[in-house]
Amino acid sequence: VNIYLLESGGRKLLFYMSPIGAPAAGAILHEVKALTGAEKFIVFGSCGVLAPEVCADKIIVPTESYRDEGFSYHFVPAADYIEMNGSAAVADYLAAKKIPFVAGRNWTTDAIYRETPNNIARRKAEGCLSVEMEAAGLQAVADYIGAELLTFFFGGDILGESWDMGNMGGEKERARQHGLLNIALELAKEI
């Protein structure tokens, strides 16, 4: 993984593209901290949306993540959910900048394409707004190595009784990615 250094406002910021899935993303986070001494990580990207009526056109800030993957259990004690410790800092920043967002539970799974209607219904009933493949594992590694993790998403596809491509692919998704990169840069300058 290539790691890039940017100096802005007298601060050094490192960037890298995290791989998909908690094991790969978590291993890279662990190695980046060991190699660079970085103590704070901002992670952002797309997610599947379980509650489009709540999440439409808003940044999603996970407050807890359902641990439907095996990776996180190697780093922190077993529990259904892991607290996303940086969520308050992200929410406070977005609120101060008047950037629309919603905060709530998330679902991390490592079973790609297995967001079945029954699983979706269960997670929605527990208050999950989104689903993705890294957050719980990354938080577990961050907790284990003593790093601070700040996470936020933008809605990609929409999962429910049927699948909707939503904002996946194309110019709209690229624009969202660039917008979130700018938010991450500004957030990094303040933490």
Task: Name each model-derived stretch.
Residues 1-89:
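Metabolite-binding pocket within alpha/beta catalytic cores that recognizes anionic/polar moieties
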Residues 68-70, 114-116, 158-163:
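Short acidic/His/Gly/Ser-rich catalytic and metal-binding motifs that mark active-site loops
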Residues 136-172:
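Zn-dependent metallopeptidase/amidohydrolase metal-coordination segment
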Residues 112-140, 146-148:
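C-terminal accessory segment of soluble enzyme catalytic cores
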Residues 159-191:
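His/Asp/Glu-rich mid-to-C-terminal helical/loop segments that flank catalytic regions of hydrolases
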Residues 89-97, 141, 183-191:
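Generic non-transmembrane alpha-helical segments
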Residues 80-126:
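Active-site rim beta-loop-alpha module in soluble metabolic enzymes
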